[in-house]
Amino acid sequence: LPAFTLPGPVARLGARLQRVYSNRYVPMIRPDGTPADSISDAALRDSLEDWLLPYLGKVSRLSHFASLDLSAMLAALLPWPLPQRLDELAPKSLSVPSGSRIAIDYSEQPPVLAVRLQELFGLAETPRIAGGRQSVLLHLLSPARRPVQVTQDLASFWANTYAEVKKDLKGRYPKHYWPDDPLIAEPTARAKPRR
């Protein structure tokens, strides 16, 4: 099946599983107490008939494969209640103070949340996943989505580094909102907050 590739969705789901259902957080166990199998490219390719066949009813040409929701199909392979726990402990995305939902990259350790700096105004602490046991690594981005700072301690960034970063960003992006106190400022996904 050359047109049907597994790596993208498999890698993303596998990374989320690895980050959460490791010994550090929650063991990956079936409800009956037996260990759950891992999902790998090889195992999925070897068992295509078992898990893919039920979804092929409306596929009549190769281009239809692109419309299949591999993430949902792979999540359905997990024993209950692992899919629900996975969404609780390792969400695909987090809501930030601006109201945006930002995808989490689980291919890195710790997982990375790349977000524009202005969208975090008003947030005092680094967002956490895995039931509060794991801080995400924040890649703070400029309005042009270029990295300006990497931190796992947002409180320290606001207290110690923000003023310096603000000077640089204010010079490069003068039309954007750069408050003196980011903890009481209104978060925004725009150049300036709405009035």
State each model region's role.
Residues 86-117:
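Amphipathic alpha-helical packing elements
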Residues 1-93, 133-195:
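Acidic, serine/threonine- and proline-rich low-complexity intrinsically disordered segments
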Residues 107-136, 140:
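Short, surface-exposed, low-complexity cationic segments
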Residues 106-107, 125-126, 147-153:
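Short conserved micro-motifs at the rims of enzyme active sites and ligand-binding pockets
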